[in-house]
């Protein structure tokens, strides 16, 4: 079951669901979702001179540089470019809700993709949402910090998760702040017995 605006407001009022800050509820709360806004930090891959990325050997965090954009200034996403962005809002899900992040239609019509694959948010997650931004247009597109960039919708589980994200061993992105690079390399770390 997808939550309606009425149910979203109820979850927010009862603090079961936290989205902070929501500066303009009239604009941000939609009939069955909440619009989230673009933060001012981006992670950009430093790929010059690299033939490929090997997640079993490379630490993606070492391959990225942070770009900070001043308020009111645009970030130009070039054709074919891929960067990580973040939402301004921090989202905290209760143990009985799953969330789905999707791009806004208006940006999709400009060729902006908001997430490559990771649109699913587990019950019990808390943190800012990392956005996997790319431009499939043939011209650069200006993105402004503070603009509504994506929408998050909420699905009620049949029962609360037995092991929500914050209790799950290996929850790599819990309490993330800002754009967060891939931690896939952790999956390949082998602990040796001594």
Swiss-Prot record:
Residues at the site labelled Important for bifunctional activity: 119-120
EC number: 3.5.4.30
This protein's pathway: Pyrimidine metabolism; dUMP biosynthesis; dUMP from dCTP: step 1/1
Active-site residue list: 132
InterPro entries attached to this UniProt entry: dCTP_deaminase (IPR011962), dUTPase-like_sf (IPR036157), dUTPase_trimeric (IPR033704)
Record key words, sorted: Hydrolase, Nucleotide metabolism, Nucleotide-binding
Reactions catalysed: dCTP + 2 H2O = dUMP + NH4(+) + diphosphate
Top-level taxon of origin: Bacteria
Binding sites annotated in the UniProt record for dCTP: 104-109, 122, 130-132, 151, 165, 172, 176
Pfam families: DCD (PF22769)
GO molecular function term, any single one: dCTP deaminase activity
Gene3D superfamilies linked: 2.70.40.10
GO biological process: dUMP biosynthetic process; dUTP biosynthetic process; nucleobase-containing small molecule interconversion
EC top class, as a word: hydrolase
CDD domains in alphabetical order: trimeric_dUTPase (cd07557)
Function according to Swiss-Prot or TrEMBL: Bifunctional enzyme that catalyzes both the deamination of dCTP to dUTP and the hydrolysis of dUTP to dUMP without releasing the toxic dUTP intermediate.
Protein family: Belongs to the dCTP deaminase family.
Subunit structure: Homotrimer.
Name under which the protein is recorded: dCTP deaminase, dUMP-forming
UniProt source species: Dictyoglomus turgidum (strain DSM 6724 / Z-1310)
